A protein has these predicted regions:
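Conserved binding/catalytic microenvironments
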Residues: 1-137
Length: 137
């Protein structure tokens, strides 16, 4: 990832594919945060998602919702289930508003990560927050 940042200026913008790294602000940091989360590095991923989301415009609803869902999963992996629910609630609201299948997939991943708390009050809060999303399926 560190080496990739130095190669961004070599991306051919004439291609109809493969230039998301030039079109998406913070693209490499999004990829880094995603990788950290999928590797189970919840603390690192959560911190990076906080930074990334500070720069995602509110108008980029679908991307923002996906990133929020990934941030919520990272918070759960960092053993911060209450924070995960707080973030997940915002992602769920965006998912209902947009109908994004990609976001629903990320929220399903959040549900899996939150399974250790499914019988706890925080788990029930998550289920309640995600209920409108699951109703749309």
């Amino acid at each position: 990832m560190d080496e990739a940042a130095g190669l961004l200026n070599r991306v051919d913008d004439e291609l109809p594919w493969g230039n998301a790294c030039r079109r998406t602000p913070g693209y490499l940091e999004v990829q880094r945060a995603t990788c950290y989360g999928r590797l189970g590095l919840g603390v690192e991923a959560s911190a990076l998602w906080t930074q990334v989301l500070d720069h995602v415009p509110m108008t980029a609803r679908r991307d923002r919702g996906v990133y929020l869902a990934r941030h919520a999963a990272a918070a759960a992996k960092a053993e911060e289930p209450e924070h995960a629910v707080e973030i997940g609630r915002e992602a769920a609201q965006i998912a209902v508003e947009t109908g994004s299948a990609r976001m629903r997939g990320e929220l399903t991943a959040l549900e899996r990560v939150m399974r250790p708390w499914h019988d706890a009050p925080v788990g029930r809060e998550l289920a309640q927050a995600l209920a409108p999303v699951n109703e749309r399926e």
